[in-house]
Design a protein with these regions (language model features):
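Active-site beta->alpha loop and helix N-cap motifs at the rims of alpha/beta catalytic domains
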Residues: 2-9, 13-145, 153
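Catalytic alpha/beta core domains of metabolic enzymes, predominantly
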Residues: 125-128, 141-190
Length: 190
């Protein structure tokens, strides 16, 4: 089942000159998106500077967004990390705040194997069993590609892995992935 249909907007995280999050401006951005019929908000993804925020800022930004959006549209929180335990901690927190789904980027820099990806995503999903997870496949940024068979395996075997944000641009890979997943995986482009 789709978490949303239509357009999910990856929100920037506005900052002051000193590098602190500008929550007043973030609220303006959120209100503008909702007023203009955005179907879902994606917070703390690549566009949201997730890799440059401290864990505290990251979680504060997610909580602020969930509170301000207040269920008017789904909020998908980016909680991925190259460290499985960090991703679990961030995911549990975001789930406790009421995130509608979690966006989990592949581990970056260390180039996980497909077996490693299965272990990583399964551990995170098992830590937040009631919260839908969307895998985020952006190998141009992470150096790690979720292969079609891996995505299909996870979708079929881990109940709350429900989708993939597929950013490879490889249409043959995407077609194969969706075929292997046999209707068990929602596809989000990005």
């Amino acid at each position: 089942m789709a978490i949303f249909k239509g357009t999910g907007v990856a929100i920037v995280t506005p900052m002051y000159e000193d590098g602190k999050v500008n929550f007043e401006k973030l609220e303006e951005i959120l209100e503008d998106q909702i007023a203009n019929s955005t179907d879902a908000i994606v917070i703390c993804g690549t566009t949201g500077e997730s890799s440059t925020l401290t864990h505290g800022e990251h979680l504060q930004t997610i909580k602020f967004t969930i509170d301000k959006v207040n269920k008017r549209v789904p909020v998908i929180a980016g909680t991925g990390s190259n460290c499985t335990e960090t991703a679990i901690m961030m995911s549990k927190e975001a789930a406790s705040y009421g995130a509608d789904a979690l966006l989990i980027v592949t581990p970056y820099y260390n180039k996980a194997t497909q077996k490693g990806l299965i272990a990583h995503y399964t551990a995170i999903a098992n830590a937040v069993p009631e919260t839908p997870l969307i895998m985020y496949n952006v190998p141009s940024r992470t150096g790690c590609n979720i292969q079609p068979a891996t995505a299909a395996y996870l979708a079929k075997n881990v109940k709350n892995i429900v989708g993939i944000k597929e950013a490879t641009g490889d249409l043959s890979q995407i077609a194969k992935m969706m075929s292997l997943a046999d209707g068990q995986l929602e596809l989000y482009s990005g």
